[in-house]
Amino acid sequence: MNRLEQLKNSGNKAFVAYVMAGDGGLHRLKEQVQYLQGAGVSAIEIGIPFSDPVADGPTIEAAGNRALKQGVTLQKVLEELQSWTFDIKIPLLVMTYLNPVLKFGIERFTTECRKAGVSGVIIPDLPYEHKQLVQPYMDKENIKLIQLVTLTTTDIRLDEILREAEGFVYAVTIKGITGSRDELSQDVKTFMQKIRKKSPVPVYAGFGISKSSHVDMLRDDVDGFIVGSAIVEAFNAGKIEEIEPLIRAVTTA
């Protein structure tokens, strides 16, 4: 069974933590994953640095640029994951743009992801209409291709995406790029309720989730939360003590 399915069956509110692979050096990724697993996160989304990250806000884009300057590549990240010998009990996700996957080779990418213990892949610039470009290879390796839906997704398109959704639905809470926000729009709550009512898989809210108040606002409307910029900022600033309160806010919801 894919670990994302195990997470769904647990019935707990999920906290998915995002880290940028290679921010501060690729050697830091292992200690970050170990810390987050020990702190109680439900899954970890590992970002692959890319030179044209169209969905990333300033915090994650800056982290990606720092990683690129360290020479971090998709291949190096997958090799790093495959080298780990400690026990990973939670799902690992890879978030990458399409271009690095095409350059690496789609079949090779999914094979190496499986060897690395990856449970799901997020490709934000892969249009839903073209998901068959990678879907057969994902299916072969039992890796879930995670779909994103946004506030601007039409009802017809939303129904199409949800009909074939797997792993979980990545529900974007803002219009625009990733990043921390002070407040979320009230429209978001209605949007999440609509998705959750229709979705056959868990619905996780992401993009802009950075405060306990965001969790409080949506706790009854989603199955989990994805937190990126706030965690990247905390690791970069050496303020990891700021991470655990966010985790507790979700996992005790």
Predicted stretch roles:
Residues I44, I48-F50, E61-L126:
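Active-site beta->alpha loop and helix N-cap motifs at the rims of alpha/beta catalytic domains
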